[in-house]
Amino acid sequence: AIVEVKVPXLXE
């Protein structure tokens, strides 16, 4: 997802 690429931390 684009959001994961911009904010890796969010994904985690």
From Swiss-Prot:
GO molecular function, one term: dihydrolipoyllysine-residue succinyltransferase activity
Cofactor names: (R)-lipoate
Reaction catalysis annotation: N(6)-[(R)-dihydrolipoyl]-L-lysyl-[protein] + succinyl-CoA = N(6)-[(R)-S(8)-succinyldihydrolipoyl]-L-lysyl-[protein] + CoA
Domain of life according to the entry: Bacteria
Domain Lipoyl-binding: 1-12
Induction (free text): By 2,4-dichlorophenol.
Cofactor annotation comment: Binds 1 lipoyl cofactor covalently.
EC number, as in UniProt: 2.3.1.61
EC class of the enzyme, as a word: transferase
Pathway(s) it belongs to: Amino-acid degradation; L-lysine degradation via saccharopine pathway; glutaryl-CoA from L-lysine: step 6/6
GO biological process annotation, one example: L-lysine catabolic process to acetyl-CoA via saccharopine
Residue runs in coiled coils: none
Keywords: Acyltransferase, Lipoyl, Transferase, Tricarboxylic acid cycle
Family to which this protein belongs: Belongs to the 2-oxoacid dehydrogenase family.
Subunit structure comment from the entry: Forms a 24-polypeptide structural core with octahedral symmetry. Part of the 2-oxoglutarate dehydrogenase (OGDH) complex composed of E1 (2-oxoglutarate dehydrogenase), E2 (dihydrolipoamide succinyltransferase) and E3 (dihydrolipoamide dehydrogenase); the complex contains multiple copies of the three enzymatic components (E1, E2 and E3).
Functional note: E2 component of the 2-oxoglutarate dehydrogenase (OGDH) complex which catalyzes the second step in the conversion of 2-oxoglutarate to succinyl-CoA and CO(2).
Protein name (database record): Dihydrolipoyllysine-residue succinyltransferase component of 2-oxoglutarate dehydrogenase complex
Source species: Delftia acidovorans
Gene from which the chain derives: sucB
